[in-house]
Amino acid sequence: MIAGALAETDGCELHLENTAGAGGTLGRSFDELAALLDAAGSDARLGICLDSCHLLASGYDIRTIDGLGQVLDEFDAAVGLDRLRSLHLNDSQTPLGSNRDRHADIGEGELGDAGCAAFLSEPRFHRLPCVLETPGPERQGPTKEELELCAKLRKRGQAARRRSRARTETRS
């Protein structure tokens, strides 16, 4: 089905999004995403979109810089970072491993400021398109203030990464 749709379409990509794992949905684990890609064929236009809320809800602990790094290493081993094409950034109303897809505004959920800062400052995400997919006030979507918060959290995450590298270099 996916291969057929891509065969009939020129000039666009299709990104399969990871899921929170509710019910019988596919795409909760990186192994499931890899199997979906394999089943769909080798079209270079087929990639993966990682959603931060879905990662946490499906059991991937991305609440810290180190945790996100380990999760991305797992993704690379199972799927390949070359297949990662886009991102959805949001916080999660539900805890790690809940398998429930409930988006929250940035910094107001289980990821918190630290998890959102880790996601926003991840070097392997640097050139990927990212959709701010948050409910916002009265479920009207992201606000200018939330975009400004994302910019601050990105800088905070980058500073934390620099401090971590400096500590590592000092120990060496």
Roles of regions detected by a PLM:
Residues 4-14, 40-45, 78-82, 118-128, ...:
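A structural motif corresponding to the C-terminal end of an alpha-helix
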Residues 19, 53, 134-135:
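Short strand-turn motif at the edge of the Rossmann-like AdoMet-binding core
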Residues 155-172:
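Short Lys/Arg-rich cationic patches that frequently serve as NLS/NoLS or arginine-rich RNA/DNA-binding motifs
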Residues 47-54:
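Alpha-helical membrane segments in multi-pass integral membrane proteins
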Residues 14, 51, 87, 130:
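Conserved, mostly hydrophobic/aromatic
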Residues 26-34, 56-127, 135, 141-144:
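Gly/Pro-rich active-site loop or hairpin
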Residues 1-47:
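Active-site acidic/histidine proton-transfer and metal-coordination neighborhood
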